[in-house]
């Protein structure tokens, strides 16, 4: 039995909920940092003989934390919208990695992905957006849960563009069979290797 569009959407939204839950601490921390630094600036600025230079470092810190908030929120907003088809694989990887990478850092883990040039060579896939996002998100979630070092590598192929998610410690990246089956129904292949998982998308 193949997965319907509504079933794929439901699976993707469940994965997105897990992703957002992982990133929530980082987002709340950045928002709190902006608020605290603004309050410090206000408090110091009210004191007589305070120079602008004495509060500039707090303004810079608030700006850095606001950048984090904007980056996470923009990624989340894009992932809640229907993906444009054909689906840009690299764009979806980057959005998911922004949220999961923030969560990984708070757990003292590291997620790295290839640069934009590498992903541009992968290109787009005809697979449904929900299926593409589901496959990428589930594989990355499992990898980050089981490893402290995870690398996401772009694989360019004329017939089947894809990606390889590698565990730095050599841990197996085993995705739930129902996720593998749902992805396969959409033409996406998820294949586990001893210390990595490969995802291939239909052109």
Where are these regions (language model features)?
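Conserved catalytic submotifs in the C-terminal HATPase_c
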Residues: 110-123
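Short beta-strand/loop element within the Bergerat-fold HATPase_c
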Residues: 147-166
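Histidine phosphotransfer helical core of two-component systems
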Residues: 2-8, 12-19, 27-67, 123, ...
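Flexible, glycine-/charge-rich segments associated with ATP-binding catalytic modules
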Residues: 1-4, 149, 159, 172-203
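Hydrophobic coiled-coil of the DHp/HisKA dimerization-phosphotransfer domain
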Residues: 82, 86-87, 120-129
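Conserved ATP-binding N-box helix of the HATPase_c
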Residues: 17-29, 35-36, 126-151, 176-185
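Conserved DHp (HisKA) dimerization/phosphotransfer helix of two-component histidine kinases, i.e.
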Residues: 37, 54-110
């Amino acid at each position: 039995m193949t997965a319907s569009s509504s079933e794929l959407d439901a699976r993707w939204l469940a994965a997105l909920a897990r992703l957002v839950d992982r990133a929530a601490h980082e987002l709340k921390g950045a928002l709190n940092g902006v608020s605290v630094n603004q309050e410090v600036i206000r408090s110091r600025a009210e004191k007589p003989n305070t120079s602008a230079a004495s509060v500039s470092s707090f303004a810079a810190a608030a700006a850095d934390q606001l950048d984090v908030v904007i980056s996470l929120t923009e990624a989340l907003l894009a992932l809640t919208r229907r993906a444009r088809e054909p689906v840009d694989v690299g764009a979806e990887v980057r959005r998911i990695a922004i949220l999961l990478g923030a969560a990984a850092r708070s757990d003292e883990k590291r997620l790295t992905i290839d640069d934009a040039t590498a992903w541009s060579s992968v290109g787009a896939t005809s697979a449904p957006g929900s299926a593409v996002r589901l496959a990428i998100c589930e594989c990355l979630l499992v990898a980050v849960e089981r490893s402290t070092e995870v690398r996401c590598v772009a694989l360019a192929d004329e017939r089947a563009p894809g990606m390889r998610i590698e565990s730095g410690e050599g841990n197996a990246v085993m995705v739930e069979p129902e996720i593998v089956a749902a992805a396969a129904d959409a033409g996406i292949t998820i294949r586990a290797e001893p210390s990595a998982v490969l995802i291939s998308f239909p052109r």
